[in-house]
UniProtKB/Swiss-Prot annotation:
Active-site residues annotated for this sequence: 80, 174
E.C. number(s) listed in UniProt: 3.4.11.4
UniProt keyword terms in alphabetical order: Aminopeptidase, Cytoplasm, Hydrolase, Metal-binding, Metalloprotease, Protease, Zinc
Gene3D superfamilies: 3.30.70.360, Zn peptidases
Cofactor note: Binds 2 Zn(2+) ions per subunit.
Source organism superkingdom: Bacteria
NCBIfam families, per database record: peptidase-T (TIGR01882), PRK05469.1 (NF003976), PRK13381.1 (NF009920)
Record's protein name: Peptidase T
Residues annotated to bind Zn(2+) 1: 78, 140, 197
GO molecular function, one term: tripeptide aminopeptidase activity
Source lineage: Bacteria, Bacillati, Bacillota, Bacilli, Bacillales
Amino-acid positions noted as binding Zn(2+) 2 in the UniProt annotation, renumbered to this chain: 140, 175, 379
Protein's organism: Staphylococcus saprophyticus subsp. saprophyticus (strain ATCC 15305 / DSM 20229 / NCIMB 8711 / NCTC 7292 / S-41)
GO cellular component: cytosol
Cofactor(s) listed in the protein's UniProt record: Zn(2+)
Amino acid sequence: MKQDIIDRLTRYVTIDTQSNPESTTTPSTEKQWDLLNLLNDELTDLGLETDIDEQGYLFATLDSNVDIDLPTVGFLAHIDTSPDFNASHVNPQIIDNYDGTPIQLGKTNRTLSQDVFPAMKNVEGHTLMITDGTSLLGADDKAGVVEIMEALKYLTSHPEIKHGKIRVAFTPDEEIGRGPHEFDVERFNADFAYTMDGSEYGELQYESFNAAEAIVTCHGVNVHPGSAKDAMINAVLLGQQFNALLPQNEVPERTEGYEGFYHLMKINGDVEKTTLQYIIRDHDRNEFELRKKRLVEIKNDINSHFEDEPIEVEINDQYYNMGEKIEPNPHVIDIPKRVFEKLGIPANTAPIRGGTDGSQLSYMGLPTPNIFTGCDNFHGPFEYASIDVMEKAVQVVVGIAEEVVNTYDK
């Protein structure tokens, strides 16, 4: 199976599927269709019934091979790659039996090293797929796509493995936060599902951040600096003042675990007008609401010193902690936990310091935890995939299909 995984992952990552946050279409880039169409053909070749809509949501069905009434389980992965780094001309490299020493990435000056990425100690002895240093790898989330496809291939070639109805979805635009926006939960018609979009071995994640975006707009008054006294209002300095009033330790680089943060993503402007773009994250819903409230309070405090209120704040929620929807459905976690135990995989249920498509899908009525893929260092040239861990992830998908039968055939 290992060589099959390498071949399939190579085939997928060399197709450029980078999404574009500036686009208003779905998918956001035409090139995402290249992989979607390939997957549609490959699913059909496996004997699955497929359904792809005009917005790039590819669904497929593996019919049940048992005569009992079972819930339908779904597996999902996104096909787009991050816009944060070059995603074209991906040239994957294979490292057999990784020995823990630094790896030079192609002909670049970039080095993949445990000194910088200590999690790589966990994949010593594994076969790795890495980049040549000029692009991201795209294992986020093409590794998840591979794992689902390899599991389907295994199930279709081993009819002795009993399973209920399985639904599969490959989706666009997750990397720009739009993955589930046009996802038709009713058409997908699963009772619960799993995103194959995690990272390190053993991850089984059912808690995510609550997430919002905030746009702070500072309006200034531009006057010639030679006659600016008591007349100029510098929008750049207003933005600086606004950010200084936020808790300086509650930022991504100083938080971990369940700790939330404010993240200043971008500043753009001049004396006349300056905008600050933030993301707000917290696992606790009450703390999340307080964080948003704090931005408004800072705005009001600064504005109170001016006749014309110069600062505006616009806040938009993006997704919520999926744990609120998954915890009332404990079987959705218990099933993969039993599979992990049978396979000897230690389950790591630490919260996601981020979100997945499952964060939004869970609030759309489809409880969807997240499972490891065996990849790390996403969105850049240091991304890598452990083929050994990917092989385990394939076994998890197959195991969940089996465990649904074991759970409900009583």
